[in-house]
């Protein structure tokens, strides 16, 4: 019996915020993408993101913005303080939001659900990135995969 060979345009190693959003954006452009992540579940990330209008539009294009409906807070006032100037720099707009604050975990959860629903993500997978080369076979869970391009998105926790 012959093993099935899987061919993809992109392998993305790391399903954090950047890796996950990149995978979705490439999928929307009709590329065949597989994303692998070492961690099996999401961390309890309490950080927030300030999202400007362009980023909001990007998240809308990906179909993720509406998934955050109950977890968005408008930015109505921005105060910038530094150690050089005595006066704070204040931006305020009472007519429209200057952006939106969202939780990292909420956005990543929505992105991961999108990837998981389409079977584009494999978690609990640790690859030796030193041995991976584009257009060379990669063994994942006893299956053979080929990728034209590889994106490594390991973020701040990467150690070589």
Question: In which residue ranges do the predicted regions lie?
Answer:
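Beta1/beta-strand and adjacent pyrophosphate-binding region of the FAD-binding site
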Residues: 2-18, 34
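Conserved N-terminal helical subregion
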Residues: 6, 73-74, 79-160
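Glycine-rich FAD pyrophosphate-binding loop
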Residues: 11-13, 24-47
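Conserved Rossmann-like nucleotide-cofactor binding loop
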Residues: 18, 41, 157
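Short alpha-helical segment within the catalytic ATP-binding CA
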Residues: 20-21, 54
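N-terminal FAD cofactor-binding segment of flavoenzymes
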Residues: 45-82
């Amino acid at each position: 019996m012959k093993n099935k060979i899987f061919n993809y345009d992109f392998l993305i190693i790391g399903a954090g915020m950047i890796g996950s959003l990149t995978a979705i954006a490439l999928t929307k452009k009709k590329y065949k993408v597989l994303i692998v992540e070492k961690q099996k579940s999401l961390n309890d990330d309490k950080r927030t993101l300030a999202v400007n209008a362009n980023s909001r539009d990007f998240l809308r294009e990906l179909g993720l913005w509406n998934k955050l409906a109950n977890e968005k807070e408008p930015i109505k006032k921005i105060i910038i303080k530094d150690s050089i100037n005595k006066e704070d720099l204040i931006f305020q707009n009472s007519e429209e939001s200057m952006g939106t604050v969202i939780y990292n975990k909420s956005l990543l959860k929505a992105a991961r659900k999108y990837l998981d629903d389409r079977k584009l993500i494999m978690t609990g997978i640790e690859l030796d990135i030193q041995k991976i080369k584009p257009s060379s076979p990669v063994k994942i869970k006893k299956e053979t995969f080929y990728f034209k391009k590889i994106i490594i998105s390991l973020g701040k926790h990467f150690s070589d």
